[in-house]
């Protein structure tokens, strides 16, 4: 696993990016061309740079919260043999389920997606229960969370620890959800 620090003007706020699947630069250029052909447009330069530097990755600070929206990033998509991590496969799977100008770029807890506008580079939160245009009655536009990916990553904070009340509820219900992907990511971060 490779680790890089995301460029930030304040060193103490630096967000470390854990690269889960590195990809050689010559293969990366080919895959970016394939992605741009698939989506029918040239990617915003800041997102193309992010993909080139990180491919499939997870930021150490991965929690987003503002007045109305809160979520945790599982990992950013990239180019992968694993269909669940591959940005092209995910784009194809969700085509028609979100606005045409958006594409998923990161897995979010609960089956949601962080998306980017293919033309403007603005970043949106796609909440599957309200924004899945493939379901009858759902046609709400996803929530704008940042003007660009760099600003979004700078807004991320460490995932908060559960409150005592949340721990009590989990113990009382006897249910703790651990997905295979979360185990894989935790193991990769320990390596």
Predicted features, each with a name:
Residues 2-113, 163-169, 178-191:
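A surface-exposed partner-binding patch
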Residues 125-126:
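Short hydrophobic/aromatic-rich beta-strand segments that constitute the beta-sheet cores
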Residues 149-177:
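Mixed-charge (acidic/basic) macromolecular-recognition segments
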Residues 129-158:
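Compact, glycine/acidic-enriched structural inserts
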Residues 117-120:
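Short acidic-glycine loop/turn motifs at beta-strand connectors
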């Amino acid at each position: 696993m490779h680790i890089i620090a995301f460029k930030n003007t304040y060193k103490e706020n630096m967000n470390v990016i854990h690269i889960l699947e590195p990809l050689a630069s010559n293969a990366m250029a080919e895959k970016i061309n394939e992605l741009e052909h698939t989506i029918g447009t040239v990617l915003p330069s800041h997102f193309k740079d992010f993909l080139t530097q990180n491919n499939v990755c997870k930021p150490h600070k991965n929690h987003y919260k503002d007045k109305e929206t809160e979520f945790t990033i599982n990992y950013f998509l990239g180019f992968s043999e694993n269909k669940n991590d591959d940005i092209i496969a995910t784009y194809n799977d969700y085509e028609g389920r979100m606005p045409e100008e958006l594409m998923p770029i990161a897995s979010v807890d609960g089956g949601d997606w962080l998306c980017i506008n293919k033309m403007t580079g603005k970043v949106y939160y796609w909440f599957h229960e309200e924004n899945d245009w493939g379901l009858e009655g759902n046609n709400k536009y996803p929530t704008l969370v940042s003007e660009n990916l760099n600003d979004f990553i700078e807004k991320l904070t460490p995932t908060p620890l559960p409150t005592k009340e949340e721990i009590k509820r989990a113990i009382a219900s006897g249910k703790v959800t651990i997905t295979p992907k979360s185990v894989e990511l935790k193991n990769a971060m320990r390596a």
